[in-house]
From Swiss-Prot:
It is found in: Cell inner membrane. GO terms for molecular function: metalloendopeptidase activity; zinc ion binding. Belongs to the peptidase M48B family. Binds 1 zinc ion per subunit. Gene3D superfamilies: Metalloproteases ('zincins'), catalytic domain. The chain crosses the membrane at residues 4-24, 44-64, 165-185, 201-221. This is Protease HtpX. Signal peptide: none annotated. Its main location: membrane. Zn(2+) binds at residues 150, 154, 227.
């Protein structure tokens, strides 16, 4: 319930901010979605508004990602290690961050029985790496080291920003085309001659939901490609055998509890599925990831 409530509040805050921005664009700069006669669409104005909504939402979410991640998982940032395991975790993150030439991320632990970890943050030098208690308790040090390397690779590769940009582009076109569909239905089916009637808003919302679901296939495809690169980065930092062993340990685990959907793309242990469900998965199947490492695909020099 806390996770759902926090998610709704975050989205409400984003909508309020975007609403103010759009009001300024329309009232001060004269940006509009209809032509001066109020009959046809002003495609330039519509595209500007769609871009503001699409990229605005993505970048606000990115800017708040560390705060949201900590609240959603209840992660505790390690200010001063309380145990040998915490000291090892901080030292390992620091060592890999130096090797990759990035700033020292915040290191956190969150209480969860599943073996998982995630990385997030708006910039490579201002990021967060969080590890579950289940991972620290269930994995060997070699396996855990590989997982940490995987998360550091996400940061080093700039995956958070990359996926934010992709999501922004996708969002822009979803909003743009959903409004065009809404306008068409309002004019052709409901015969609204000037301005926009209720059918425009209802149809636009419905079209945005449908197009958003379809567009998520594109975002998830990119996410899966970045996951292969993060595995390769983890192999480079910790060793290929350790990375393979970590993925095989995840494969053997059962009844895994997943991270919140908003964080899953940057975890180590992604969602599972088969058939068409794989189109909407943020992570490739573990068998494919293991095979890619064994074959040396995606490995960096």
């Amino acid at each position: 319930m806390k996770r759902i409530g926090l998610f709704l509040l975050t989205n409400l805050a984003i909508l309020v901010v975007l609403g103010v921005v759009l009001f300024i664009l329309q009232a001060v700069f004269g940006v509009r979605t209809l032509d001066e006669a109020g009959v046809g669409l002003d495609y330039t104005g519509l595209l500007i508004i769609a871009a503001v909504i699409g990229f605005g939402g993505s970048f606000i979410s990115l800017a708040m990602s560390k705060f949201i991640a900590k609240r959603m998982t209840g992660a505790r940032v390690i200010e001063k290690p309380r145990s040998e395991a915490e000291q090892w975790l901080v030292d390992t993150v620091r060592r890999f961050a130096r090797q990759e030439g990035i700033g020292m991320p915040e290191v956190a632990i969150y209480d969860a029985p599943d073996m998982n970890a995630f990385a997030t943050g708006a910039r490579r030098n201002n990021s967060l790496v969080a590890v579950s208690t289940g991972l620290l308790q269930s994995m060997t040090r070699d396996e855990a080291e590989a997982v940490i390397g995987h998360e550091i690779a996400h940061i080093s590769n700039g995956d958070m920003v990359t996926l934010t940009l992709i999501q922004g582009v996708v969002n822009t076109f979803v909003v743009f085309f959903s409004r065009i569909i809404g306008h068409f239905v309002d004019r052709v089916v409901f015969k609204t001659e000037q301005g926009h009637g209720p059918a425009y808003f209802i149809t636009s919302i419905f079209a945005q939901i449908v197009l958003g679901i379809l567009a998520s296939v594109i975002v998830m495809w990119f996410s899966r490609q970045r996951e292969y690169r993060a595995d390769a980065g983890g192999a480079k930092l910790a060793g290929r055998d350790k990375m393979i062993a970590a993925l095989e340990r995840l494969k053997r685990s059962v009844d895994q509890e997943h991270l919140p959907d908003q964080l899953e793309a940057f975890g180590i242990n992604g969602n599972r599925g088969g058939g068409m469900k794989e189109w909407f998965m943020s992570h490739p199947p573990l068998d494919d990831r293991i095979a890619a490492l064994k074959e040396g695909r995606h490995l960096r020099g």
